[in-house]
Structures are given as C-alpha cells and as structure tokens.
C-alpha cells in the first residue's frame, strides 16, 4: 500500500508550480498536535511583515492514519483543511516539508495543491535522502516550496518573521495553541520593530541603556 502511495506522491509532485508571488499582506500558519486519535489543529493569521495577529482558530477532529515518516500528508491533511476552510490569506506556512522530501511532495506541497494557494514548508529537521537544492536553512528551520511560490520568496518571507529564537513567530503561536500551552494570543511587536523603538527612545531619554 505504501509503495503505491509513494508512486502517487511522485506523480503529484509534477503538479507543483513555482512562481513569483504577488504582494503579501496576510500570512497564515498552521500546526497540528495529537492526543491518541484526536487531532487539534491551530491556525494563526497575521499581517505581513508587521506580524500583528488578526485571527486565531483551533479545531479538533479524529484521525485514523498512523504517523509514518514521509507519509505525513495522509495524517494531517484533514485537520489542516478543516482549520483553513473559509479563511483568507496570501501565504500559508505549514509545519512540515514541501518539496524538501525524498519524493518531492511533502505535506506543505499537498496542502498547497489541494487549496490552490501559495504554501511554504517549514520543518526543524530534514528527511533522509532530501535533495539539497530543494531547501534553505533560515534561522533554526528548513524552508522549502510548498506550491505557487519560489524558494527565494519563501525564504524572504520566513526570514522577515523570525522571532528572537530563530523560529517563525506565527508558526510558533500555532504550535502553542495546538498543544494548549496558550489559549489566546496578544499582539507584541516583532523583534525588529522593538529594537527600532528602543533605539528611538534612546535619543529622547537620558535614562536609556544605549541599546
């Protein structure tokens, strides 16, 4: 069965389209966590590049397919599609690989093909036998094309929204929401904006620490 699915992945990889993306104003990120057969998917939609949270959404559903490396899309597609249904965004960041996959078709690519939306794959680790020309290391994550975006544009977008730990802020929020570590999101300035504001205060405030 898995061999047949692997062949389908190879065929579907040919449906991935790489192209320059137009103006990006809203970036969404989605992550899924599990407890037994329950999947909890969290979606976070933010402005770009400011990073202000516009909306959060958490859904729960059942899953029947087990976790099998390189076949992640069979397990996570359902909760992600439920979480993104009816939502609008310019780019979707998916916790999982896109073209950076042994068969060139990871979760982020499958979601992008199904939704017909620009998607970016982001993962903390590489899969074995991943072609080196399919990803870039940005901060602490590996970035790859999901669908309808170039690797150059995907890299620029992720670099612009990294937090101080080197992880994309919207995706980190989605991760925490999916795991129930937080239940609401409060807007905070991005690290770049915070540093700029501190620098401006230093010009007007004699008590500034000189940052």
Curated annotation (Swiss-Prot):
It is found in: Cytoplasm. Mg(2+) binds at residues 31, 95. GO terms for biological process: DNA repair. Residues 182-211 are annotated as: Disordered. The record marks 67 as: Interaction with target DNA. It catalyses: Endonucleolytic cleavage at apurinic or apyrimidinic sites to products with a 5'-phosphate. InterPro entries: Endonuclease-V. CDD domains: Endonuclease_V (cd06559). One of its GO terms (molecular function) is single-stranded RNA binding. Its main location: cytoplasm. Its cofactor is Mg(2+). One of its GO terms (cellular component) is cytoplasm. The keyword Metal-binding applies. Keywords: Cytoplasm, DNA damage, DNA repair, Endonuclease, Hydrolase, Magnesium, Metal-binding, Nuclease. Its EC number is 3.1.21.7. Belongs to the endonuclease V family. DNA repair enzyme involved in the repair of deaminated bases. Selectively cleaves double-stranded DNA at the second phosphodiester bond 3' to a deoxyinosine leaving behind the intact lesion on the nicked DNA. This is Endonuclease V. It comes from Pyrococcus horikoshii (strain ATCC 700860 / DSM 12428 / JCM 9974 / NBRC 100139 / OT-3). The gene is nfi.
């Amino acid at each position: 069965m898995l061999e047949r699915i692997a062949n389908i992945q190879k065929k579907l990889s040919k449906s991935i389209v790489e192209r320059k993306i137009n103006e990006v104003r809203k970036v969404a990120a989605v992550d899924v966590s599990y407890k037994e057969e329950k999947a909890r998917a969290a979606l976070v939609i933010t402005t770009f590049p400011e990073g202000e949270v516009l909306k959060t959404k958490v859904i729960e559903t059942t899953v029947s397919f087990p976790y099998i490396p390189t076949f992640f899309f069979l397990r996570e597609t359902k909760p992600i599609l439920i979480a993104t249904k009816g939502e609008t965004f310019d780019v979707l960041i998916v916790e999982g690989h896109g073209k950076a996959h042994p068969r060139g078709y990871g979760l982020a690519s499958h979601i992008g093909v199904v939704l017909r939306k620009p998607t970016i794959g982001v993962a903390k680790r590489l899969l074995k036998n991943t072609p080196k020309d399919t990803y870039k290391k940005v901060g602490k994550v590996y970035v790859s094309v999901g669908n309808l975006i170039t690797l150059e544009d995907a890299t620029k977008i992720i670099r612009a929204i990294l937090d101080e730990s080197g992880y994309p802020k919207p995706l980190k929020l989605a991760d925490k929401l999916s795991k129930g570590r937080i239940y609401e999101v409060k807007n905070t300035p991005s690290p770049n904006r915070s540093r700029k504001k501190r620098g401006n205060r230093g010009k007007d405030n004699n008590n500034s620490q000189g940052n």
